[in-house]
Amino acid sequence: MEENEEMIVNNEPVIYTGPNIFDFGLFQFQVFQEGLPPYVKRAIEKIPDINRLIVPVDELENTRAKIEKSGTLEARIFYKIQQESEKLKAKRK
């Protein structure tokens, strides 16, 4: 079981720290309290790295700092999600 899946089973509030993805209705800093809604699960199916930027609420500050620091794993994942969402958007046009 992945770390994020375990958090959801425990119903711990989690927050999405990745970029806005309008096509999926997923917005930065959305909080989920009782598992992930179906639209988020669909987004993760298309862009699996989204799951890596869904963290416990109490890790928000630390995760944001890592995203803002160039070269960190979190910053690279953030950028990759942006790129993949743009590719999906371009395919629909």
Model-derived features: positions:
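Terminal and domain-boundary regions
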Residues: 1-93
